């Protein structure tokens, strides 16, 4: 029970402020939805205006979306200074994607001067906000000793946490560490489980890693058909090594009937996705330079998932 009018008045003011904050947040979220709808329609002028309103009403994702538009020049003139400004606002408003974007920019020197301490700072903030991208990126930095003292234990811990936050890339990385005994005791069962999770989260590299385990029978029964399907899924998810492995299976007839046309088709896709091994094979097999393959691959309408 409140024993004095002073305390009671303070409580009333607190409740009024809470209601006001709720109304502001609700209004800000409405502007954010309006901005997103405008962006999808291609009405970038309105999108910017509504994102700004939502950002000014302290909706962090509104600030982040605006930062992304300015960083990529998506519907607006590219402006890195504005991108950093809005990402900072978004991060300060506890949007983990904004923190991750700042971390990435400072880690790579993408439009800003490279600054690893700042990258680590923003990744840590994003990870604290349960952002899988930030936790995973920080894990990679600890694994490689980039801007921090190399620490496999921290790398594994952060990567596991990122995987639990549905960041598939980190699931693949955890699997890699267990499969190859990188800073941890080799454990193929754990490797398999993490590759499966990453593939389920639509990380192409995880699907390829899982496919390899089925192809060679690593802690699972060897299964060429399963390997092929996983490689195809990796290819569909834009992983060049997945396309390449499908091509190799069709070219050699390993686990599937030989099919040179399908092999060449997948080699083209692998090359287009930047997998140099596919480009090299194509030059040897059909004598085409990798630069000449872009149109061929784009015109190839074969469904990777079939």
UniProtKB/Swiss-Prot annotation:
Task: Answer yes or no on keyword Cytoplasm.
Answer: no
One GO MF annotation is: beta-lactamase activity
An example GO BP is: response to antibiotic
Signal peptide (residue range): 1-25
Report the record's disulfide bonds: 55-63, 91-99, 127-135, 163-171, 199-207, 235-243, 271-279
Name the top EC class. Answer: hydrolase
Q: What does this protein do?
A: May hydrolyze 6-aminopenicillinic acid and 7-aminocephalosporanic acid (ACA) derivatives. Binds to penicillin.
Q: What is this protein called?
A: Putative beta-lactamase HcpD
Query: Source species, please?
Result: Helicobacter pylori (strain ATCC 700392 / 26695)
């Amino acid at each position: 029970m409140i024993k004095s009018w002073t305390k009671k008045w303070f409580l009333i003011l607190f409740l009024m402020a809470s209601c006001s904050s709720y109304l502001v947040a609700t209004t800000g979220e409405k502007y954010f939805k309006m901005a997103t709808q405008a962006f999808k329609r291609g009405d970038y002028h309105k999108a910017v205006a509504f994102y700004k309103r939502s950002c000014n009403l302290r909706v962090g994702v509104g600030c982040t979306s605006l930062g992304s538009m300015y960083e990529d020049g998506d519907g607006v003139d590219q402006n890195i200074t504005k991108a950093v400004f809005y990402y900072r606002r978004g991060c300060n408003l506890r949007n983990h994607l904004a923190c991750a974007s700042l971390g990435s920019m400072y880690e790579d020197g993408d439009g800003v001067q490279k600054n690893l301490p700042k990258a680590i700072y923003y990744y840590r903030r994003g990870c604290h906000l349960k952002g899988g991208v930030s936790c995973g990126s920080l894990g990679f930095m600890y694994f490689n000793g980039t801007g921090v003292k190399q620490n496999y234990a921290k790398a594994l811990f952060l990567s596991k946490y990122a995987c639990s936050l549905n960041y598939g890339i980190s699931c693949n990385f955890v699997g890699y560490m267990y499969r190859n005994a990188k800073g941890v005791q080799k454990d193929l069962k754990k490797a398999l489980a993490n590759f499966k999770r990453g593939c389920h989260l639509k990380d192409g590299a995880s699907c390829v890693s899982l496919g390899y385990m089925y192809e060679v029978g690593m802690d699972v029964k060897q299964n060429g058909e399963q390997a092929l399907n996983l490689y195809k899924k990796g290819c569909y998810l834009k992983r060049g090594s997945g396309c390449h492995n499908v091509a190799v299976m069709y070219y050699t007839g390993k686990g599937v009937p030989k099919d040179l046309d399908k092999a060449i088709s997948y080699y083209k896709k692998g090359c287009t996705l930047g997998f140099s091994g596919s480009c090299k094979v194509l030059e040897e097999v059909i004598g085409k330079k990798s630069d000449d393959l872009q149109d061929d691959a784009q015109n190839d309408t074969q469904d990777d998932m079939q």
